């Protein structure tokens, strides 16, 4: 009977755990839809800024912004690492951290030091344990990322590159593909390559141009900063959508596993109960036969 009592306790414990994971699955599903909406809403802004910057670059080929110039000979690179603040989202953070660690090693083999910016508590903890140099950080973004919270940390990297102190700036995050699939991405943020502006932006390479106030150079300077900030914001939005998707899938798997465990425990309980009843009947029959 002690075994049956222990099994009943385990069943109750797993049932309570399943209630929690089921609730977390439903919450993650709701947050995932909102995160996807924010992610999709951010894309047109970044694309429009890119299109305007592409037009201005063609119209003013003599001007090269520092973001578009390679800092050759510099032995330090920058890395913006985007992770989540919370766990329970499967291998999402593990994958991007593993890829980032590999990138760190590649840069070190090339004689490059790395100065990192952490967006998200998991990445910050990883960088501190790894012994990386963290020059700026943003944590506790919540479920809704705001650009004003990101600008300060990102600007640290942009300023260092503009001053010629970084050879390149890389951006590591998780790209949202669909609910069941997310991709780890490490891409070069700076210097901006011609590929950023060569894509068809819907504007013809014509002889006409806008009138810029105060002047074209000032507009380009401001526009490219906004463009890079938009790329980082888009990465954070993609990462948050990936986080909620991964958490929903992980919690669903946990709920399904809990259901399986409950069934197995219930079967063990029934076997123990049947064995106890059989034993009692045997004792009764044995006692009657003795009489």
UniProtKB/Swiss-Prot annotation:
GO terms for molecular function: ATP binding; proton-transporting ATP synthase activity, rotational mechanism. The keyword Cell membrane applies. Pfam families: ATP-synt. Keywords: ATP synthesis, Cell inner membrane, Cell membrane, CF(1), Hydrogen ion transport, Ion transport, Membrane, Transport. Its main location: membrane. It is a peripheral membrane protein. One of its GO terms (cellular component) is plasma membrane. It is found in: Cell inner membrane. It comes from the Bacteria. F-type ATPases have 2 components, CF(1) - the catalytic core - and CF(0) - the membrane proton channel. CF(1) has five subunits: alpha(3), beta(3), gamma(1), delta(1), epsilon(1). CF(0) has three main subunits: a, b and c. Belongs to the ATPase gamma chain family. This is ATP synthase gamma chain.
């Amino acid at each position: 009977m002690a075994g049956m009592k222990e099994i009943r306790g385990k069943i109750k414990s797993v049932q309570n755990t399943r209630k929690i994971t089921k609730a977390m699955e439903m919450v993650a599903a709701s947050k995932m839809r909102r995160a996807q909406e924010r992610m999709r809403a951010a894309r047109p802004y970044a694309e429009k800024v890119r299109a305007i910057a592409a037009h201005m670059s063609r119209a003013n080929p003599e001007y090269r912004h520092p973001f578009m110039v390679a800092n050759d000979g510099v032995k330090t690179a920058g890395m913006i690492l985007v992770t989540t603040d919370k766990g329970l989202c499967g291998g999402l953070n593990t994958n991007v951290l593993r890829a980032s660690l590999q990138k760190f090693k590649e840069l070190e083999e090339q004689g490059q030091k790395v100065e990192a910016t952490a967006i998200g508590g998991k990445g910050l903890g990883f960088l501190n344990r790894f012994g990386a140099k963290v020059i700026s950080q943003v944590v506790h973004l919540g479920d809704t990322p705001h650009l004003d919270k990101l600008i300060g940390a990102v600007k640290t990297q942009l300023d260092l590159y503009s001053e010629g102190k970084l050879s390149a700036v890389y951006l590591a995050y998780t790209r949202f593909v669909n609910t069941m699939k997310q991709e780890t991405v490490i891409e070069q943020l700076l210097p901006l390559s011609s590929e950023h502006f060569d894509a068809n932006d819907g504007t013809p390479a014509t002889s006409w141009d806008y009138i810029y106030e105060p002047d074209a150079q000032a507009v380009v300077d401001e526009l490219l900063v906004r463009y890079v900030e938009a790329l980082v914001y888009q990465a954070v939005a993609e990462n948050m959508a990936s986080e909620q998707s991964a958490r929903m899938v992980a919690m669903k798997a946990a709920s399904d596993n809990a259901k399986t465990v409950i069934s197995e425990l219930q079967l063990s309980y029934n076997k123990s109960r049947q064995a106890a009843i059989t034993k009692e009947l045997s004792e009764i029959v044995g006692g009657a036969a003795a009489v």
